[in-house]
């Protein structure tokens, strides 16, 4: 099945502690149906010193959130929208904005 939200998309969080925040999708985890969004759902982890990180301490990193809790922000109209699929004349399958009808994939 084609993914409605992909890496590099700008999304808005619909519910939870970060409701209303927007950010770029850094990683998509299809098996768990989750996405990692830059600057959203930031958690603190206690890191022990190791070979890669000489100094330990508390680090902040983004944690995955469910894909159903985010909505794609349309590049043309700038609104959080649902995504649909359609075929172009040449037969390629593209995503489009359900609010304004513009094609998202160029």
From Swiss-Prot:
One Pfam match: KOW
Record key words, sorted: Ribonucleoprotein, Ribosomal protein, RNA-binding, rRNA-binding
GO molecular function: rRNA binding; structural constituent of ribosome
First and last residue of the signal peptide: none
GO biological process: translation
Gene3D superfamilies according to UniProt: 2.30.30.30
Any single Gene Ontology cellular-component annotation: ribosome
Family as reported in the entry's similarity comment: Belongs to the universal ribosomal protein uL24 family.
Subunit organization: Part of the 50S ribosomal subunit.
Functional note: One of two assembly initiator proteins, it binds directly to the 5'-end of the 23S rRNA, where it nucleates assembly of the 50S subunit. One of the proteins that surrounds the polypeptide exit tunnel on the outside of the subunit.
Protein name: Large ribosomal subunit protein uL24
Species of provenance: Thermosipho africanus (strain TCF52B)
């Amino acid at each position: 099945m084609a993914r409605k939200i992909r890496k590099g998309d700008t999304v808005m969080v619909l519910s939870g502690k970060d409701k209303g925040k927007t950010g770029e999708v850094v990683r998509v985890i299809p098996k768990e149906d989750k996405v990692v969004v830059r600057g959203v759902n930031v958690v603190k982890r206690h890191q022990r010193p190791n070979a890669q990180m000489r100094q330990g301490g508390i680090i902040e990193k983004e944690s995955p959130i469910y894909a159903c809790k985010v909505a794609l922000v349309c590049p043309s109209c700038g609104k959080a929208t649902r995504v649909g699929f359609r075929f172009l004349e040449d037969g390629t399958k593209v995503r489009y904005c359900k609010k304004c009808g513009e094609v998202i994939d160029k």
